[in-house]
Design a protein with these regions (language model features):
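A structural signal for short, well-ordered beta-strand segments
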Residues: 36, 87-89, 110-112
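Short hydrophobic/aromatic-rich beta-strand segments that constitute the beta-sheet cores
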Residues: 45-47, 69, 117
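C-terminal edge-of-domain segments
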Residues: 79-80, 94-132
Length: 132
């Protein structure tokens, strides 16, 4: 059983870009837009892109092990929707280049521990979060 609702899964499958938040060993926050895919088999998000192997986001994820990722849009005025996923970051050193064209071999797999959504199964202005 997925940690995401069926409507959330459909939303994740329809999107390709989100924002990854990490924290450095010194405690400095870092947020960067990057591509992702939802891996339905593992029920995780996989985040990657070009130059991932040398990126701050990969170093932060490897060092801290905790990340957050937000996917959102607003297809109509005043109708925002999105999902925030917080969880454990697994740095995977091979296979990213087989997931998506333009990705480096290295990528970050996010294993969800908390999901918050708005405008998908809920009112767009009343996010609902849950530990998973």
């Amino acid at each position: 059983m997925s940690v995401f609702t069926p409507a959330e899964v459909e939303y994740l499958k329809s999107q390709r870009l989100g924002r990854l938040a990490t924290v450095s060993a010194a405690g400095d926050p870092h947020v960067v837009p990057c591509r992702f895919r939802y891996n339905e088999e593992l029920d995780v998000l996989e985040v990657g892109g070009g130059n991932m192997g040398k990126s701050k986001k990969l170093r932060d994820a490897a060092g801290n092990g905790r990340v957050a990722y937000v996917i959102d849009d607003s297809p109509e005025p005043r109708k925002p929707r999105g999902i925030e996923v917080r969880g454990r970051a697994e740095v995977v050193l091979t296979g990213g280049d087989e997931i998506m064209k333009g990705w480096d071999p290295e990528f970050i797999r996010i294993v969800p521990s908390h999901v918050a959504a708005w405008g998908i199964d809920t009112d767009p202005f009343k996010p609902k979060g849950r530990s998973v």
